[in-house]
Every structure is written in structure tokens, then in C-alpha cells.
């Protein structure tokens, strides 16, 4: 069994895969509670960590002491059919790298790869499997919260309120109260960035790319895209974990 672990900015996610790539079980916890996590037993472990050394140290304290294979990944120049076009390949976030590998494995075609969590990453894969660049912006909740913190008359919207406001996923762009206007602004900033990347990649590749979306706000972004681009968008759960499975099993 292979245990895949994705230490993100706010939460740590994990998934247990069997040899044929079936996800048998998965879970998550806040990084602040990582030492209480009950991880499943596995013979191999592969980890992506973008949460820093403190979280790595805490995670290591609960990993099995017995001699099993534990691999902390770094982005490579080329792996699993994906070429890394970053200026310094090792500086690409390991979560982005794993998600790109999973996306290429799924489509093997031009893709916009979106991971929507505390931050939103929007990355471009061309028709040959080369990562040609991407962008990072604040997550939807983070945009709303920070706007309230630095303005005099706008409310500070907590994560709880933000999630509640988004329960139906669709947000009217013509908002008629301040809280909804802030919510709409954050959502459509993220969606607009996704749509711009999709348009730019279509021009670059001379064909229509797919959009693969993962992360806690994946549904919120997908449901608020506009126009024909919606036909190319799909949600893929656990994209980073699936990429980690591929790296462990198919990378040289």
C-alpha cells in the first residue's frame, strides 16, 4: 500500500492507494492538529510539503519509525511525461508539480490546472506536456477576509460566513449588498484568472484546452465560470494525491 500525503498551507490531506492506483481511503486535518492525525498503515509513503519545516517536523513525529520508504518530493526538470518550464525547476511548489503530473496523465492534452485552496494556483500545460508557466493568487476566502481587514467600511468576512454564503455555489455577479459584492468580487477574480489563462493557452496551442480543477473551492470556481469555457471544465478530486501516486510508481 502507498500512503500519499499533501501538506498544504492550511490543511494536510492524505490518501491510501493500492498497486493499481485505486484510492482506498483518504482524510484531512488542519495543520494545527497534524500531530493528532491518524494515518493509515502503508508500506511506502510519498509526501508533498509546501507548509514549511515546522509542519515537516511535526509530520515526521507521527510517521512510522520502522524502516519503510518515505520520499519527500521536489519538482524535477522532467517526470512522468511532464517537462518543467520554471526558471528554477526546484522552486516550483511540489503540490503544483504533482497536480500537473496528474492532469497530464488524465488528459495528455493542453490543460489549465487549477488548485483552489488557501491560495489559487492556475498552471498551463501545453500539447507536449510542458508546463509553460502559471499564476498564484489569494484564495477566495483569503481575498474576502483581507479586504475587510484593510478597509474602514467593509466587513471582515470569516471563513465560516464565506462558506455559508457559497452554499449554493452560484454567486450572482450583479450583487446587491456589500457582503455579496465582496463574495462576488473574490469569486470572479479567481474565475476571471482561470478564463484568461484558458484563452491565452488556447492561442498558444491553437486548440481548446481542458480545465481541471481541484481543491476545497473547486466547485465554487467551476459553477461560476462563464460562456463556452464551462464545457471544458471538470473537477478532479485529490489531484495532488493522484500525482504523488504516479511519481512514486512511474518516475525513474
Report residues per predicted region:
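Divalent metal-binding pocket/active-site signature
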Residues: 114
Amino acid at each position: 500500500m502507498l500512503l500519499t500525503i499533501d501538506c498544504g498551507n492550511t490543511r494536510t490531506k492524505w490518501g491510501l492507494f493500492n498497486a493499481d492506483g485505486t484510492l482506498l481511503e483518504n482524510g484531512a486535518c488542519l495543520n494545527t492538529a497534524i500531530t493528532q492525525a491518524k494515518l493509515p498503515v502503508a508500506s511506502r509513503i510519498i509526501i508533498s510539503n509546501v507548509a514549511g519545516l515546522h509542519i515537516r517536523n511535526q509530520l515526521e513525529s507521527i510517521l512510522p519509525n520502522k524502516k519503510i520508504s518515505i520520499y519527500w518530493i521536489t519538482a524535477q526538470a522532467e517526470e512522468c511525461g511532464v517537462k518543467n518550464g520554471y526558471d528554477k525547476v526546484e522552486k516550483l511548489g511540489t503540490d503544483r508539480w504533482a497536480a500537473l503530473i496528474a492532469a497530464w496523465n488524465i488528459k495528455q492534452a493542453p490543460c489549465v490546472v487549477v488548485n483552489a485552496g488557501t491560495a489559487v494556483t492556475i498552471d498551463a500545460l501545453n500539447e507536449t506536456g510542458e508546463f509553460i508557466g502559471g499564476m498564484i493568487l489569494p484564495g477566495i476566502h483569503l481575498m474576502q477576509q483581507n479586504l475587510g481587514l484593510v478597509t474602514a467600511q467593509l466587513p471582515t468576512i470569516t471563513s465560516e460566513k464565506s462558506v455559508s454564503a457559497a452554499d449554493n455555489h452560484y454567486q450572482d455577479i450583479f450583487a446587491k449588498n456589500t457582503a455579496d459584492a465582496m463574495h462576488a468580487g473574490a469569486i470572479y477574480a479567481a474565475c476571471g484568472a482561470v478564463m484568461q489563462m484558458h484563452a491565452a493557452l488556447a492561442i498558444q496551442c491553437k486548440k481548446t484546452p481542458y480545465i481541471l480543477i481541484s481543491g476545497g473551492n473547486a466547485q465554487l470556481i467551476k459553477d461560476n465560470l462563464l460562456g463556452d469555457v464551462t464545457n471544458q471544465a471538470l473537477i478532479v478530486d485529490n489531484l495532488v494525491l493522484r500525482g504523488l501516486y504516479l511519481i512514486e510508481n512511474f518516475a525513474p
